[in-house]
């Protein structure tokens, strides 16, 4: 939908109404890039939580408004939730066995190591890769230096006042303020063309 709105000649920008704790990492980088490279302003209106995957793509917005001191922003981190149903199936007397050809011995290796050996080394390697991308993106979009020891890059969330003071969001405002900001950008763009 965002691509269609950006392409529409009568739409001057987009306001994202954000209240989300994050979620799946899949394609959040693609959404972030779309927002960052948009020729029209895309603004976030945060009301509640803007964490993890939501924080990832919102960091690319041209402006980030918060609605309340209770808004939470941040959680630059990743998590992998592993669920094993092996014991449950055993209790139900259901036997499940996976077979792999010798030529695909690396298939599902991270999952298998965790399940069979309680070794999450490969999972953590993958998570480190994702977290590095996430942290570098946040640093670039917020214009801050990446520091692995900074709580911002270690998964901490911040209430709105702190996030505002640190530059992670831009201003307090209402949904109407966000809409007016987008509309004003079109006026500024037109005025700059006239000068």
Place the predicted regions along the sequence by residue.
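Small-residue-centered hinge/linker elements
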Residues: 1-40, 49, 55-141, 185-195
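Glycine-rich beta-to-alpha transition loops that act as phosphate-gripper elements at the mouths
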Residues: 44-51, 152-156
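Short acidic-hydrophobic, aromatic-tinged amphipathic segments that line or gate anion-handling sites
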Residues: 64-67, 169-177
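Residue-level recognition of oxygen-bearing side chains
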Residues: 84, 158, 174-177
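Secondary-structure end/capping motifs
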Residues: 134-162
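A ligand-binding cleft/hinge motif common to bilobed small-molecule-binding domains
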Residues: 176-184
């Amino acid at each position: 939908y965002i691509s269609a709105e950006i392409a529409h000649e009568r739409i001057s920008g987009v306001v994202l109404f954000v209240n989300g704790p994050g979620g799946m990492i899949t394609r959040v980088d693609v959404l972030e890039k779309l927002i960052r490279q948009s020729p029209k302003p895309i603004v976030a209106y945060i009301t509640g939580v803007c964490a993890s995957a939501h924080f990832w793509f919102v960091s690319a917005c041209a402006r980030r408004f918060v609605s309340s001191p209770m808004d939470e922003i941040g959680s630059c981190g990743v998590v992998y939730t592993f669920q094993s149903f092996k014991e449950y199936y055993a209790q139900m007397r259901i036997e499940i066995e996976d077979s792999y050809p010798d030529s695909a011995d690396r298939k599902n290796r991270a999952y298998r190591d965790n399940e069979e050996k309680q070794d999450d080394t490969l999972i953590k390697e993958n998570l480190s890769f994702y977290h590095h991308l996430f942290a570098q993106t946040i640093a670039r979009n917020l214009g801050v230096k990446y520091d692995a020891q900074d709580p911002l890059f270690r998964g901490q969330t911040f209430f709105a006042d702190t996030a505002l003071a640190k530059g992670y969001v831009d201003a307090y405002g209402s949904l109407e303020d966000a809409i007016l900001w987008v509309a004003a950008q079109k006026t500024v763009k037109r005025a700059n063309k006239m000068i």
